[in-house]
Amino acid sequence: IWYQFVFEDGTKFNYSGNEEEMEKQISAISPDDVKGYIKLVNFTKKIFEKGYLELSDVPFTKPFFMMKQIPSLLKLKSYKSVYSLVSSYVKHEKLRRILSMHPLLVGGNPFTTTSIYGLILYLEKKWGIHYSMGGTGNIIKGLETLMNEENIKIKKGFEVNKIISNGKTIKGIRLENGDEISANNVVCNADPPDVYERLLNKKDLNFFFNFKRKRMDYSMGLFVYYFGTKKVYKDVAHHTIKFGNKYKEHLDDIFDKKKLNDDISYYLHRPTATDNSMAPDGCDCFYVLVPVPNNQSNINWSESGEKIKNLVIDKMEKDLLPNLRENIIEDFYLTPDYFEKDLNTKFGSGFSIQPKFTQSAYFRFHNKSEIYDGLYFVGAGTHPGAGVPGVLSSAKVLDKIL
């Protein structure tokens, strides 16, 4: 299975690429929704073909190119949210939650994220769910190996604290130790809103760019709790998503009201289900990710972090991992403060700006800076967006620009 979904009433749904099994489980919940599910998958195939195969690695730097796409995007119901699109095909609330959850994987609210992101549903159907053996860090190691093979010099351990410009022409970067490196082109994988605010001269930013920048909506924050256990929980899937009692209300609290509540939903990652090298023999390892408000909330995470940790341990102990607390041997957690202070994301958001229609493609921060000659962006805040496939695709976009 790809994901196991768990509901408060104990219902479990094993989400996979086996369509026969999928339809059987859907029928057990709501027989009338099987046909709607099939139609939904077929519709998301059309979105995938346009939004991913055709546009995910294409630069959106010119308004005319964006305008050319509008008729096709409207035909694909891009004006609807993912939840609204799913709801037009299936009626049972549990199925609506399961089939509309994908925007959360890229920092979006299913109730406001454009239905174009419904393409993730079909992307998984086409190519499956993949895991980097040894952890996601091995993707970075692989890229480093490739760079070394191409004789690209890598300088580690120095934070960039200034991008140097002469007027609106990029001249290089300054490191935290004071060293300067001259360059005509700077490719930046940091969060664009933070870069424009902190590393560049704000006087260079024009009225229209500032107007757009200051009105952007940011993705949720993340509470991420890593823990190892002296017990193996062999029946727990690699990916588990547990829904709280309320769905929309919980998302409203996170994205709009910017407040915490106890009725949490969470995602539990157990890599040892696939890769037993991730924990010693007889042990298990996990992280649990809880969507929380970003730092626009002004939440004191030094106080709230410990409360959420204990809350989520209690929930997991009840839902999936019996006697968890007594079996934890190593643990630590990260809050939006880590994302803001260590990773320099604006407001500690986990995925940069939200993937709403008005913040997608041309309306995101451009891969080729709108302000500076010689400044380019890759990563979650630029086109096409967050998530490993999106971030890696942003490099493909840049390859077509440079």
Which positions does each model-derived feature cover?
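C-terminal segments that line or cap access tunnels to active or ligand-binding sites in enzymes
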Residues: K230-E340
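Active-site-adjacent "gating/activation" loops or surface patches in catalytic cores
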Residues: I98-K126, H130, S369-D373
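Helical element adjacent to the flavin cofactor pocket in flavoenzyme catalytic cores
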Residues: L119-N177, N184
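A conserved FAD-binding loop/helix module that cradles the flavin
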Residues: A380-L402
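Mid-domain catalytic core of redox enzymes
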Residues: N161-P280
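Rossmann-like flavin
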Residues: E8-T112
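A glycine-rich dinucleotide-binding beta-alpha-beta segment and adjacent secondary-structure elements
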Residues: H92-V106, D263-H269, P322-P384
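N-terminal FAD cofactor-binding segment of flavoenzymes
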Residues: I1-W2
